[in-house]
Regions:
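Amphipathic alpha-helical coiled-coil/heptad-repeat segments
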Residues: 3-177
Length: 177
C-alpha cells in the first residue's frame, strides 16, 4: 500500500513536471521572440533617425524607408513565429497558468499582447517626411521599446520561476524514488 502510494505520487510529480516543461517551452519561445525584436530596435531607431533628416533626397528616403519596412517586417515575423504548441504569448494570447506542485499551486506566464499591437502600430506609421519620422520616434518607437523591455523583464522572471520549480520538483522526485 505504501509503495502504491509512492508510485502514484511519483506519477503526479511527473504530470506536474510535464506541464511546467510545456509552459517553459511557451515562455522560452516568447522570450526569444522578444529578444529578437529588442535586437532589431537599435537598427529600427537608426533608420528612423536617418529618415528624420530633412536634408536627404527622395531617392535616399525611399531606400531608407525600404530598409525600415524590412526591419519592421522582421520584427512582425518574430511576433508571429514565437509560437510553441500553438500558443503565441506576444500576440492574441491569454495568460498561461500551469500547476506547480501537488497542492494545486500555479505559476503563470503573462500574455504580452502589446508587443504585437505596438509592432503593428509602428508598421502602419506614416514616415513620408522628416517631421513624420521624428513623431514616430517620439510616439510609436518609444511605445514599442517600452513594451518590449517590459515583456523581456516579465517573461524572463516568469521563465526563471518555471525553471526553479522544475528543478525543485526533480529533486523531490529523486529523493522519493
Amino acid at each position: 500500500a505504501i509503495a502504491q502510494g509512492l508510485r502514484g505520487q511519483l506519477k503526479a510529480f511527473d504530470a506536474v513536471t510535464q506541464g511546467l516543461l510545456n509552459a517553459k517551452g511557451v515562455g522560452n519561445v516568447a522570450l526569444a521572440g522578444a529578444a529578437g525584436i529588442s535586437d532589431l530596435l537599435g537598427d529600427i531607431r537608426a533608420k528612423l533617425t536617418e529618415l528624420s533628416n530633412g536634408g536627404i533626397t527622395t531617392q535616399q528616403r525611399n531606400i531608407l524607408l525600404a530598409d525600415f519596412n524590412s526591419l519592421v517586417s522582421q520584427a512582425a515575423n518574430f511576433v508571429v513565429n514565437s509560437t510553441f504548441n500553438g500558443i503565441t504569448l506576444l500576440t492574441g494570447a491569454t495568460n498561461i497558468n500551469t500547476l506547480s506542485n501537488l497542492q494545486s499551486g500555479t505559476l503563470s506566464l503573462t500574455a504580452q499582447t502589446n508587443v504585437g499591437v505596438q509592432i503593428r502600430s509602428i508598421a502602419g506609421a506614416t514616415i513620408g517626411t522628416a517631421t513624420n519620422a521624428q513623431s514616430v520616434i517620439a510616439l510609436q518607437f518609444s511605445n514599442v521599446q517600452s513594451v518590449v523591455n517590459a515583456a523581456l523583464g516579465t517573461l524572463g522572471a516568469e521563465v526563471r520561476a518555471l525553471n526553479l520549480q522544475t528543478t525543485f520538483l526533480d529533486k523531490i522526485r529523486d529523493a522519493t524514488s
